[in-house]
Amino acid sequence: MSGAGSKNHLSETPTIHPDAIVVDCDLGAWTEVGKSTQMRASSMGDWSYITQDCHVVWTSIGKMCSIANGARINPGNHPTWRAVQHHSVYRAAAYGLGEDDHDFFAWRKADWVTIGHDVWIGHGVTITAGVTIGTGAVIGAGAVVTRDVAPYTVVGGVPARLIKRRFSESQAEALLEIAVWDWSHKEYKAALPDIRKLDIDDFIAKYRVRSGSGNGSA
């Protein structure tokens, strides 16, 4: 990941920093994984990127997502309902206590995090197990997200709470229908000037008509 004002040249082949650890993951086109990030048993859609020093496991990340430094997505839960919640209870083999608790790991693995499209996750965010982040949401820096986040809302704090909506419900519904993240590279490139310059209502008015074909082409 490059510094401010510049960026690596990406391609349809995922760009993974040599110091990153990516295991059993499915990465889309134009994706990037930054330095010292660990990503395991997860998927990430086209255009999305994860910057430095993030940990991600058992997570589905949509397209066009932006994940800032130090994010922790689906950190492991401990068995708080048991008399002892320490590692040794479920990682018993490491302590010479017998077999690991495979049922516990199956329970943990089943509790995926799901992140929609075009989501911005700020620096140092933690997203706990089982949470769904709606498309277009913004998660403020340092937030701890313990509940689902609605599409096109801004949340922040510990625990994360609603701060505001980015757009009205009708505008959000229109953007979900237009689904820019599903456009081809060519279509997206052609629309980029409008994305930069048009206000939200003008953008919706122009591109909602085109979305009936399932893409952003004229």
Where are the regions a protein language model picked out?
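C-terminal segments of enzyme domains that contribute to small-molecule binding surfaces
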Residues: 12, 17, 86-127, 159-218
